[in-house]
Amino acid sequence: LPDSDIWREQQCKLPYGGELVNTDTRNTSYTARAQVDYSFQFLEDHQITVVAGTEARSSKYKGLKSTEYGYLPDRGEKFVEIDPVQWPKYGDLVKSHPNVITNTLTNVMSWYGTFTYDYMNRYIVNFNIRADGSNKFGQDKSNRFLPIWSVSGRWNLHEEAFLKEVMWMNMFAFRGSYGIQGNVSPDQTPNLLIQLGSFDPISKQYISKLSKLPNPQLRWEKTTSWNFGVDFAFLDNRLNGSVEVYRKKGKDQIISKEVASTTGSTTMQLNAGNLENKGYEIVLNVVPVKTKDITWALNINGARNINKVTKSGITTDYGYKEYLDGSAVIPGEALNTFYSYKYDRLDANGLPTFKDIEETDGITQTEMFAKVFAYSGTRVPDITGGFGTDISYKNLAIGGFFSYSLGTKIRLNNLYNDSGQRLPQPQQNMNQAFVNRWKQPGDENRTDIPVLTTDPLDMYGLGIDRKIKIADNGWEMYNKSDLRVASGNYLRLKNLYVRYNFSDRICHKIRAQMISVRFEATNLWLLADKKLKGQDPEQVTLGGVSTPPTSSYTLGLDITF
């Protein structure tokens, strides 16, 4: 065969036809509730409301997802039989996308009650209590039902007698709350789960494997939180908004822990993590201009959240991949914190080199990783928010909204594959960055893009006989080095609209209540780190490729009769 045909058979995943994906899901849910409400007033100004009830919920989800390859819809909806021996990549594709059957049952039993006291709509106190039980927890009866409760209060200052005559104050209030909440993930179970597989033609036996190890002590994730806020509205509501501060402490967070493979699995779900979140939220709305024909409104919102792992509950050392992808839960650091190799330079042959990767006798894995990796940041932003404006003149309205994000770091998409990089086949695309690659001795002084080569650059290629594994090869290290980390801060024009409402005279001609024409556009403009070079900062990946937010344009005509 010609070289191109040999390459095609070796590399092509789907030589003929397309994919036919069948998805069949059924969800059956039942809910039964009994509730009693009682409210009474005494001494004219005092109001008490009491609610008590119980609720039972059951939800059964069953689904089947299958993918068939070689589908020819234009040829009688037939399938091509493809030989996986001749087309090995096709065989890998089929193995990586097996048919999936989902069958889950979730049962929840709840009791709840509320007590509310209201004095002249001036002082309001509320107390809530609830107990939920779920089949997602273990045999320990003390862990099945978690009583969660909260107490909150509100002081409407604008209802006070000394502020009743302040005409410019429409509303001014303080509020606060304290309580305990519980959470359960639908993916968790205390029971031993065995995944029944298909038939193995080699051993002539059916295949089964452990999916989840049993944990009878599995219990609710608990969060203790408090918040304090101020709500206000002044000048006939032309200036209004709110400010809130909060703090949340999570306990018994469910995390994945590595266990000995002799148990039949490599991980186990445990209540072992503690997490703290604190921050504030601000919302402000202003109407600077409001006349008979013109209205101009501004709005802005922002939020800052700081999270920190106070306890990980993990005694087993993490592998290097957990540090790279941000899944390592490290006390004192934020969740989703990731680390990178320390890029040094290109050598005289155009190959990447890295700092502090030499192995020292007697060094532990944790100590080695602390030397090899550099802190890169977190994938979760510290500050998020947006601001916008709306302007209307008679029947014409124009508006837009910007969103922003600060404090996050992201990886650039992988530049090399795990076996290096070579010149592509004519039908393949290539990253534009390779235009500035190393091509000849001396180029290492002008570029940080390595040479095109088939050298796998494994750890022995780096000249290191490793006892503690820090990477699969040098190309993985380059892709996940601090050189390939960029700021995720951005300012985006999220949407823009223009709308025109036709006059009542025109509407009456066709007996319509309202006629309007509108144009809307989303994701029109982006200000971000130049280092991204077209990669979208909201395309949060750690080396993989995903589809960024796309721009869209809509022209519509709305008629209401």
Predicted segments, located by residue:
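Extended hydrophobic/aromatic-rich secondary-structure runs
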Residues: 1-19, 127, 364-366, 375-380, ...
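Extracellular/periplasmic, surface-exposed regions of secreted and cell-surface proteins
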Residues: 1, 12-333, 476, 480-561
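Short aromatic-centered micro-motifs
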Residues: 117, 359, 391
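Short helix/loop capping segments that flank catalytic or ligand/cofactor-binding pockets
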Residues: 51, 60-62, 185, 339, ...
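C-terminal substrate/ligand-recognition segments
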Residues: 382-407, 482-504
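C-terminal beta-signal and adjacent terminal beta-strands/loops
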Residues: 167, 308, 363, 392-476, ...
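Conserved small-residue
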Residues: 65-72, 270, 280, 287-379, ...
